[in-house]
Amino acid sequence: MGIKFLEVIKPFCAVLPEIQKPERKIQFREKVLWTAITLFIFLVCCQIPLFGIMSSDSADPFYWMRVILASNRGTLMELGISPIVTSDLIMQLLAGAKIIEVGDSPKDRALFNGAQKLFGMIITIGQAIVYVMTGMYGDPSEMGAGICLVIIIQLFVAGLIVLLLDELLQKGYGLGSGISLLIATNICETIVWKAFSPTTVNTGRGTEFEGAIIALFHLLATRTDKVRALREAFYRQNLPNLMNLIATVFVFAVVIYFQGFRVDLPIKSARYRGQYNTYPIKLFYTSNIPIILQSALVSNLYVISQMLSTRFSGNFIVNLLGTWSDTSTGGPARAYPVGGLCYFLSPPESFGSVLDDPVHAAIYIVFMLGSCAFFSKTWIEVSGSSAKDVAKQLKEQQMVMRGHRETSMVHELNRYIPTAAAFGGLCIGGLSVMADFLGAIGSGTGILLAVTIIYQYFEIFVKEQSEMGSMGGLFF
């Protein structure tokens, strides 16, 4: 059934826009240039408002997910990377459940990637229609069918641009992946803004600056009681404070420390005697994939819950899925879950919230740990990084594990890889929960993504440097 399904969609994949693989090796400085161009296009799209919207001042139902999904409200980047990640999530689950069987041949892999792109485009159209018809930009009946169609087309074209930018980097023209680059950029931008934002907010304590560091100097300069001013700068509520910044730096350090955990399996050449090496299996074997897929799952649940709440408010089943409330305390208007499944799957806002509702905290912990471990273990089976795939790669390179025959390599690798994937996903989920409870800026999930992505780019840079031989060879 799996192969038949991929064959059915093959004609559709053939007409999709595609970035051709480079015919020559792309130099590092060219990769940096293409990566910078990708980043520039994304940042420009984040600033271009959608044409035809009547209002985007209502409570933002997806405020909590925008940092993670590289989304910016009311702009061309309204959908961010959500369609791509959702498509990957669906295809991964279908392949993991053996509903779609993906072979090891390049043809099957290419067809699977084409199916992901096709579903990404379909999901982009679907999400655009949902956003418009649920009144996020104004009452559809007042805007008219023409304006609604124009907004949907804008969102679709922007989503297609994101798909192609991601493919551009994935094909080897740039560094890393487009998804990772856009996520890291958005999260780092948020952290810098929350630290140094000059925007003023009217609170019950008077006018304050949004940025935590700017607020520190402002409070010290304007308050006569310096001790109280310091206390407010460190612990003020509903706005970024210095404890949030300290927690963010602490989580950065912890994640970087865990990045170094790995098991080195000794391997040797089957052709040349005396040629030894090691194959590293990292603790974070699947890197940030589990947290990205978990974010996609939750964000789509939020979309469905918000859509149903708008249309069928008061319905028992809808309320069971999630009930929502609006707030504008300490920032832009936003909607947040106050009941139902969505509430229990959302992170507590602070450590105080954990103490106020320990059941919520416990369910959230179980969900995060379980989902990250599940997605991590499932991902290795569909991404070509399982024990069988690694053994095949080593065999093609004419390498064998020391003390083991070729036939027993899969069995030996199976002792490490699935365990590393599941336990690594568990650790990723645990670190995300810790960051949420400590109040790190950008959410625990966001911080985890930013650190792992930045570390990936550091490893890419080191690898390119070793291949070029020197720092000067990278750019000149």
UniProtKB/Swiss-Prot annotation:
Its main location: endoplasmic reticulum. InterPro entries: SecY/SEC61-alpha, SecY_CS, SecY_dom_sf, Translocon_Sec61/SecY_plug_dom. Residues 54-76, 139-144, 194-240, 310-354, 442-445 are lumenal. One of its GO terms (biological process) is protein transport. It comes from the Eukaryota. GO terms for cellular component: endoplasmic reticulum membrane. The chain crosses the membrane at residues 34-53, 77-96, 118-138, 145-165, 173-193, 241-261, 289-309, 355-375, 421-441, 446-462. It holds the Pfam family SecY. It is a multi-pass membrane protein. Component of SEC61 channel-forming translocon complex that mediates transport of signal peptide-containing precursor polypeptides across the endoplasmic reticulum (ER). Forms a ribosome receptor and a gated pore in the ER membrane, both functions required for cotranslational translocation of nascent polypeptides. May cooperate with auxiliary protein SEC62, SEC63 and HSPA5/BiP to enable post-translational transport of small presecretory proteins. The SEC61 channel-forming translocon complex consists of channel-forming core components SEC61A1, SEC61B and SEC61G and different auxiliary components such as SEC62 and SEC63. The SEC61 channel associates with the multi-pass translocon (MPT) complex. Belongs to the SecY/SEC61-alpha family. This is Protein transport protein Sec61 subunit alpha. It comes from Boreogadus saida (Polar cod).
